[in-house]
């Protein structure tokens, strides 16, 4: 849901310090900083994403809830 480069498809790649290829994601410049919200995750089961930071609790909570809603709508995630 980030306005910056949200139309691009992310591709996993090697990054020093990681055992697996990773996708790095950062939705930036909403409140003026490049560290507002970022996440990364290894490309292997169980496909976990690690939220690296956020400037405000509300911003991070909205982003995580939006991501979960999108996964549920696309039937990529079920919550029982």
Swiss-Prot record:
InterPro entries given in the database record: Met_g_lyase_put
Pfam (any one): Met_gamma_lyase
UniProt similarity note: To B.cereus similar ORF in glnR 5'region.
Protein name (record): Uncharacterized protein in glnR 5'region
Lineage: Bacteria, Bacillati, Bacillota, Bacilli, Bacillales
């Amino acid at each position: 849901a980030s306005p910056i480069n949200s139309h691009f498809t992310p591709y996993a790649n090697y990054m020093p310090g990681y055992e697996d290829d990773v996708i790095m994601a950062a939705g930036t410049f909403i409140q003026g900083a490049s560290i507002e919200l970022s996440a990364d995750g290894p490309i292997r089961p169980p496909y976990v994403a690690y939220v690296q930071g956020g400037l405000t609790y509300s911003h991070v909570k909205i982003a995580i809830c939006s991501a979960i809603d999108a996964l549920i709508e696309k039937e990529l995630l079920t919550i029982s």
